[in-house]
Every structure is written in C-alpha cells, then in structure tokens.
Amino acid sequence: MYPSVLIAIDREDEPGSQLLAARCRAFLAMGAMGLHLVHVRTPLPRSYLAELPDHWEANDRSEVEGWLRDFAKRHSLDENVIDTHAPSGSVAGDVIRLANELRGDVIYATAHRLDLVRLLLGSNIHAIARDARCDVVVVRE
C-alpha cells in the first residue's frame, strides 16, 4: 500500500496524537510500512537563542526525538519506525520538505476543528494537503 509513511505528530495535541497512533496501527495491520515520525519544533527568536546555553538547540532536538521514540513504543509502532525527525521551523514547510527528501509515499496528520482564526489564516494541514507531492491522509475523530 504505502511503503514509506511520514507521520506528522503535534506533541501539544495528545488526543490527536493518540488518534493518529490508533489509525496508524490499523493501517499497519494491512501491510508493512516504514514509519518516519516528525514533530516540527517552534523556532525561537534569535534574541532568545543568544541567552540560551550553547547546545540548547541540539539538546532540544534530541529531547523531542526521544519523545517521538517513546511515543512509538507506547503505541506499539516502534517496530516499524525507521527514523525520528525534529526540525525547527514551519510546520507545513518542514513536513513537506521531509516527505520529499525521504521520498515518502504518504503523510498522515491530524486536523484540528476549524475555528475562525484558522478559517481566515489557513491551517498547517490545509497547506500540507495543498502542496505535498505525495498522498495526504487527514485523520479526524
């Protein structure tokens, strides 16, 4: 079906992440897939970075990648995980960039309910679905 899957996880959205894991397990039951887990970290302003310890960025990335590995283990996805990724930047831009670099066949992501701000400004999932070269599976309740 989809041999290479990029799973975009929002660490701040625990219910959405659990739902995404459940759907991934269901898809795994249909056949083997290699999973790449990604959480895009919010970049800090340069003025903040100047005040942080030298290795803060590397430590933050390492901590998030550890969280992704723990997430995979907690949700019985770890046997299929190829790698974890924790870039810092634009959610939609970095998810699409990773999918292209990894030659992903599909991106799985959750969609938050639409509110007025997202309606006016757009959402990450909308940008991913619009701009990705591969299939995008949007998981909802």
Which positions does each model-derived feature cover?
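Structural beta-alpha unit
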Residues: M1, K73-I107, L114, H126
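Small/aliphatic-rich secondary-structure junction motif
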Residues: M1-E51
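General small-molecule cofactor/ligand-binding pocket signal
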Residues: H36-V38, D83-P87, V137
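Short secondary-structure boundary segments
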Residues: H39, T110-H112, R140-E141
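A short acidic, glycine-rich active-site loop
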Residues: D54-G66
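Glycine-rich, Arg-bearing micro-motifs that act as flexible, cationic patches
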Residues: A109-D131
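Short, flexible loop segments at boundaries between secondary-structure elements
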Residues: D131-E141
